[in-house]
Amino acid sequence: MLDAMLSGLSGLVAGFTHLHWSNLVMMCIGGILLYLGIKKDFEPLLLVPIGFGCIMVNIPLADLMEKGGFLRTIYDFGVITELFPLLIFIGIGAMTDFGPVLENPYTFILGAAGQFGIFLTLLLALALGFPYKDAVTIGIIGACDGPTVIYVASQYAQHLLGPVTVAAYSYMSLVPVLQPPIMRMLTTQKEREVVMKTHQKTVSKTTKLLFPIVITIIGGLIAPHGLPLLATIMLGNFMKESGAVARLTKASENEIANIVTLLLAISIGATMSGPVFVKPTTIIILALGLLAICLDTVCGVLFGKVLYFVTGGKINPLIGAAGISAFPMSARVVQREGQKYNKKSYLLMHAMGANAGGQVGSVMAAAVMLSVLKGMGII
């Protein structure tokens, strides 16, 4: 009887005896993510559930990520199938206004230039010895687009899902900190003071309706393996612009997006178990992700300088920094920096065009990369 009681009591301390130091480290990291989300307002909709999921999965013997476990069920249902990131893309499309990029088509080029960091980081990751699939997943952090990162990682490098997702969303929230020093370093005082004329053009409803259809068809033909990414964001935008399915549009950008974001974030946190996450490669991945986003900004601003030269000084190179997918955060950074040097400068609409172009550019970059690698037989 006494032995049975002692055995029963030993079950109460089993969790403590199986606690590994790496679990404690990850619990602390989960706590830091909660702090950043709540106190610092860094992407709270993502970092709060990711942080809590991270804490949960590092409690020993709970078996949350074992077959049939609570977190494993959610993970298999929405992440492995890529359903969650694609549903979020429909919501993003429903919330995105491509009007600014249609008013100023040249800003679409800036959105493309802002993706070069992806490919440069991919090459660097390969040079450091990462396998092809891992290098692609690390490079895609430069898309500065969480759902794209999650989609690629869930397909080709599930073991990196936690690190690359945390890197993507953390650095997205740090865009207002990361971009201004790079913008100032690469531009002159004269360039930063350029006042751009705002031409108020009216984009017809027909154009706005045709845009997502044309992009889906052309993008799908060029890079068919990335079509799910491109088609879902364009579907959301088409529903918004049509005005015929207001209930679906509202549900996509509110209820569906909120529920899926919660489940997706918890699932990502569930991949951050101590023995898997606490490795030297994680630090390298975080460093490469930071480099990718910085290189995006560098390439965008440098291309902005090219346009400044070509147009005889009519384009402010700062708007090139908005060519990433952090929408509309990056456009606001450009507006703030421009007004800091010239109170008469109003760059927001031009920057919003580049930013909207970056939304499409990041998805197209991922789609092209996946299709090229598929054609080479690498993935």
Tell me the role of every PLM-derived stretch.
Residues M1-H18, L24, P181-L210, A244-K250, ...:
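Intrinsically disordered, low-complexity non-transmembrane regions of multi-pass membrane transporters
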Residues L33, I55-M56, T81-L102, N237-M239, ...:
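Hydrophobic transmembrane alpha-helices of secondary-active transporters
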Residues I38-L47, M65-Y75, M95-L110, V245-N254, ...:
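Interfacial helix-loop-helix linkers and transmembrane-helix boundary segments
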Residues I80-T81, I90-M95, L110-L120, L124, ...:
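Alpha-helical membrane segments and immediately flanking helix-loop junctions
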Residues V101-L122, S273-G300, A351, N355:
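Entry/N-cap segments of selected transmembrane alpha helices
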Residues L160-V177, L288-L295, I319-A322:
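Alpha-helical transmembrane segments
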Residues S170-A244:
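Membrane-embedded hairpin module used as a gating/binding unit in multi-pass transport
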Residues T216-G300:
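Transmembrane helical segments that form the transport core of multi-pass membrane transport proteins
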